Amino acid sequence: SLEKYADQVPVREHEWDNRHFWRVSNAEQLEMSADCGIINLSHFHMTDISGPDHVALLEWLCAAKIGGDANIGKGIYTHFLDDEGNVRADFTIFRLADRCRLVNGADAGPRDLNYMRRVAQDRGLDVTITDVTEDFTTIGIWGPNARTKLQEVVEDPAALEKDAFPFAAIRQVRIAGRDVSAFRISYVGEQGWELHMPYADGLAVWDALRSTGVIAVGVETYANSRRLEKSLRLQNADLRTEYNLLEADLARPKVKEADFRGKAKHLEYRAREHQPAMLCTLVMTDNIDSSGIARYPVGILPVLDPDTGEVLVDELGRRSYTSSIAYGPTIGRNIALAYLPWSHAREGRKLVLEYMGETFPAEVAAVGYKPLYDPENLKPRS
């Protein structure tokens, strides 16, 4: 892939910016976007919540509606809020007939599992909460040809057709003689599925997918570069308890009827004329440093006002730093997410990022959730 896309993937000349296989990762992303790729997602943490009160527990903890027969067989992206209505966690819940499976990141998973256990105990709920991470593994398959490639290896190819398999649905398929739960979703902005299966079946399914000629794509594309081109938020980076769900622009159009933790504060925030800050997408408009070297920043960068040279501070005293940053090879820019004060959260607003003692011009490309790549989100639903 690197040979194929060498002219589209920058060479990072500065030693600090080049401490990773960035060019390989970027080339993999471009190939996935042009054709198809599979990604090892075995780092997912999984928790099963069952028992008579399992829906009641999750209805209380989650901002999204979990109950109701209409949600059975669906994947629900949702959040835990704290009592202040700020974002404590994000994850996907698979609403199964007799239980819910919470699919989480490896870092936040154990934390959220123990939190659920404590809340269930405090509220006297009859639930069983089990860590099933070691029992299952996940493979992502994405790209414009994901359906075609997956149809080569499933027993019932017609079941994958667009009308038969709606976006966000979960269906059982068979690959290489193994039962697989296919979840039609995308964190990389392309058509495709998460494939969930027993851990012991992972290698057989992986080999079957590879036999179609698809490339294996590293997790950098999933976790950073394409994620930022899609304006997707990362827990413990962009989603933190210092900011609320509206500032992260992840609030649903309507608030569910059922009570949930943080609901009162969430309603209070919704009634505001505007939020104190908004999570915005920034692009660096010039990345050449004083030595004439193009920089590709990593880490956390202060966001400055170009007129004063001072770090931006919102009305609650929160300072603006990049919460995520990566080079997006499809867009061809360094892209960052950062919470900006309402006064500065305007598309086209000129800002400055500080990196290693130097300043680089940037501008606000989007306020709130607004992808730079495929802004209408047509590709994942294709």
Language-model segment annotations:
Residues E28-M32, D83, D90, A176-F183:
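Membrane-targeting and insertion segments and their boundary/processing signals
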Residues P52-V87, P144-R178:
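Internal amphipathic helical hairpin motif
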Residues S1-K4, V9-H20, N26, L96-S382:
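Conserved, structured C-terminal
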Residues W60-D122:
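Well-ordered mid-protein domain cores that form the structural environment of catalytic cofactors
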Residues S1-T78, N86:
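Acidic, proline/glycine-enriched N-terminal capping motif
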Residues S33, S42-H43, R88, R95-D98, ...:
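Short, well-ordered loop/turn elements at secondary-structure boundaries
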